[in-house]
């Protein structure tokens, strides 16, 4: 039994089948990229895996239990960062991290922002930051979270090359420690092919 399992998922949108019979099992330490053309359903699949949406058929299981039966405990193990940064624009970058990680002290939050490339921007209201900087505020959570499972939708959007490298290193560290990373990205990942598992939505099934 894997940590996270998708079993015979079917998803339809506007009378169009995005994917059907989609099954796969993920284990601790896996780093997975969901691939497919625009409109293939990558974001939709991520939302199914977070439990924010339900499939038209099939089910998603966490440690052998359907998500809807373990929703609360599952969400405690999950970090989800979608297309929108999901941050409070009236708060500063530092205040945002305190809001999401109340058990993190100031030093930890400052270090996370520095790791995300935001040293010197800690006390600036988020609504005064660029799109890329706002994205970095959300992604700074990767250096604070204790979640086992990270689901990230296009995390590298509006991030420069150095930022992408730093984030990639953090994801590698997380999987090496037994965590799971699932992401979509249009950017090539600068990691060994042996470290990445790809699940394609251009096919009806994934192993």
UniProtKB/Swiss-Prot annotation:
UniProt xrefs under InterPro entries: AAA+_ATPase, ABC_transporter-like_ATP-bd, ABC_transporter-like_CS, ABC_transptr_haem_export_CcmA, P-loop_NTPase
Domain ABC transporter: 4-207
Keywords of this entry: ATP-binding, Cell inner membrane, Cell membrane, Cytochrome c-type biogenesis, Membrane, Nucleotide-binding, Translocase, Transport
Subunit description: The complex is composed of two ATP-binding proteins (CcmA) and two transmembrane proteins (CcmB).
PROSITE patterns xref list: ABC_TRANSPORTER_1, ABC_TRANSPORTER_2, CCMA
Encoding gene per record: ccmA
Binding-site list for ATP: 36-43
Protein's UniProt name: Cytochrome c biogenesis ATP-binding export protein CcmA
An annotated GO BP: cytochrome complex assembly
Lineage of source species: Bacteria, Pseudomonadati, Pseudomonadota, Gammaproteobacteria, Enterobacterales
Membrane topology: Peripheral membrane protein
Function description: Part of the ABC transporter complex CcmAB involved in the biogenesis of c-type cytochromes; once thought to export heme, this seems not to be the case, but its exact role is uncertain. Responsible for energy coupling to the transport system.
Record SMART domains: AAA
Catalytic activity, EC: 7.6.2.5
Location relative to the cell: Cell inner membrane
PANTHER family: ABC TRANSPORTER I FAMILY MEMBER 1 (PTHR43499:SF1)
């Amino acid at each position: 039994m894997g940590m996270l399992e998708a079993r015979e998922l079917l998803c339809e949108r506007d009378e169009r089948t995005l994917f059907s019979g989609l099954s796969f099992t993920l284990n601790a330490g896996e780093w997975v990229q969901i691939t497919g053309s625009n409109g293939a359903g990558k974001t939709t699949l991520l939302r199914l895996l977070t439990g924010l949406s339900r499939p038209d058929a099939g089910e998603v299981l966490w440690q052998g239990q359907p998500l809807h039966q373990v929703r609360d405990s599952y969400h405690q193990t999950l970090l989800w960062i979608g297309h929108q940064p999901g941050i409070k624009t009236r708060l500063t970058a530092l205040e945002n991290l305190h809001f999401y990680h109340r058990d993190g002290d100031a030093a930890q939050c400052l270090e996370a922002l520095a790791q995300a490339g935001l040293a010197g921007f800690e006390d600036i209201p988020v609504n005064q930051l660029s799109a890329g900087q706002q994205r970095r505020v959300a992604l700074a959570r990767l250096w604070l979270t204790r979640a086992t499972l990270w689901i990230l939708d296009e995390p590298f959007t509006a991030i420069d090359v150095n930022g992408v490298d730093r984030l990639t290193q953090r994801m590698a560290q997380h999987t090496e420690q037994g965590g799971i990373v699932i992401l979509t990205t249009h950017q090539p990942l600068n990691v060994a092919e042996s470290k990445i598992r790809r699940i394609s939505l251009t096919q009806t099934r994934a192993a």
